[in-house]
Amino acid sequence: MNILITGGTGFIGRALVKSLLKEGHKVTVLSRTPDTVNKIIGNEVTTLSNLNQLTSEHHFQVIINLAGAPIFDHHWSDARKQIIRDRRIQLTEQLISYIKAATVKPELLISGSAIGYYGNQGNKVLIESSSPASHDFSQRLCADWEATAQLASQFGVRVCLIRTGLVLAHDGGLLQRMLLPFKFGLGGILGDGQQWMSWIHKADWIAIAKLMISNTAMQGVYNATAPHPVTNSEFTKTLAQHLRRPALLPMPAWLLKILLGERSELLLASQRVLPERLLTENFHFQYPELLSALTEPRTNHE
């Protein structure tokens, strides 16, 4: 297949690109820095620096939309929030415009989202049909991003939305950020530790995306989370045991709010999410339990 990917150099995107190339797909990556694409992935991919380089004659069977400015890396000033929104929603709007003009429409649009869509819901079990409980920045961002991507359906395109949990793998993402303080015995629970953390291993996320490509009956929203979410306290205990290190330095919620401001909601919000629709599809999770994800071979980066 001929596949266009935005966000192809990110933590998930670069592994997805490599996996699709191994299966013989032709991959085009949209990136503001095409040279970076070739350095990270190699010369097997075609690169674009701007969607304006596409014409109505370009034909992609699948578009996978993962692009977006990192949400956690910088203080959420009003200007930063606008950048985070624009790089997701404006780019998605541009993709919709391309799809509208395309002589041959893509068969499938897979577009990113996150479980932040649900807001802070305590112990409530959340499935794809669950309503959001709050309308904070993260929730509005996810809802607006999804609504924009859904516009592709009016042109006969099958749309799959991936509400992604906390993505784990040893070569990046949340786990890599947490490893260093835990290795030095400086890890600990965040807030009261009772907030639910719905996570997924990167290899399972990639398998979900590839299933969406092959299974033409799949459409709509899917929770990309492992079937066994854990509380922050359980996550901390399991990671500390895996590393054989103590976890003795809890981080109070008030201190997180001082240090991170509004971003602290990403660490303190509780989302107990289950992948109901994937389980209905009999999707096989390679890493259904947290310990299995933490102990995966370090060479397994795809």
PLM region descriptions:
Residues 3-23:
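N-terminal Rossmann NAD(P)H-binding glycine-rich loop of SDR-like oxidoreductase domains
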Residues 36, 43-94:
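NAD(P)H-binding glycine-rich loop region in Rossmannoid oxidoreductase-like domains
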Residues 93-135:
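Conserved Rossmann-fold NAD(P)-dependent oxidoreductase catalytic core, especially the SDR/UDP-sugar
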Residues 113, 147-170:
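Conserved beta-loop-beta element that borders a ligand/cofactor-binding pocket
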Residues 133-137, 165-172, 192-202:
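Glycine-rich "substrate-gating" loop/helix at the edge of Rossmann-like oxidoreductase active sites
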Residues 179-187, 195-230:
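Alpha-helical substrate-binding/gating segment
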Residues 215-262, 295, 300-302:
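Mid/C-terminal beta-alpha module of Rossmann-like enzyme folds, strongest
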Residues 265-302:
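C-terminal amphipathic/interface module of NAD(P)-dependent oxidoreductases
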